[in-house]
Amino acid sequence: MFKFVMVFAVLGLAAAVAPVSRSDDVHAEVKVLSSDVRADGFDTDLVVDNSIQQAASGDIHGNAHGSFSWISPEGEHVDIKYVADENGYQPVGAVLPTPPPIPEAIVRALAWLEAHPQAPEHGAHH
């Protein structure tokens, strides 16, 4: 009986310390890879069998938009969409940090300053 318990204890310990891998990212295979580059823009697509995906399109003016996604180590689906244009790179996604709200005292101070513009000084030399 003691040997029986010891065998199961060793097997349980081995199972507990064995590395668990959701996927083998090193050996991931590309399922889709396409690229279409034209005089008026481009389109690209990438799909990998480990849940990584990427798509992008661009136009003749240098603007681009697209998306990329993957599964985080915590198992969360991460999805980022973006636009890149004259206003810069603008990503959007639930996992991206957002700035904290402006404190109420600052909001009130800004509203007061807007409601009470400073009068120009007479006689000031510029």
Curated annotation (Swiss-Prot):
Q: Mind listing the UniProt keywords for this protein, alphabetically?
A: Cuticle, Signal
Outline the extent of the Chitin-binding type R&R domain: 39-100
Show the InterPro entries listed in the entry.
CHIT_BIND_RR_consensus, Cuticle_Struct_Prot, Insect_cuticle
GO CC terms in record: chitin-based extracellular matrix
Q: Which GO terms describe its molecular function?
A: structural constituent of chitin-based larval cuticle
* Signal sequence region: 1-16
- Top-level taxon: Eukaryota
User: What does this protein's UniProt record list under function?
Assistant: Component of the larval cuticle.
- Protein's name in the database: Larval cuticle protein 2
> What phylogenetic lineage does the species belong to?
Eukaryota, Metazoa, Ecdysozoa, Arthropoda, Hexapoda
The record's gene field reads Lcp2
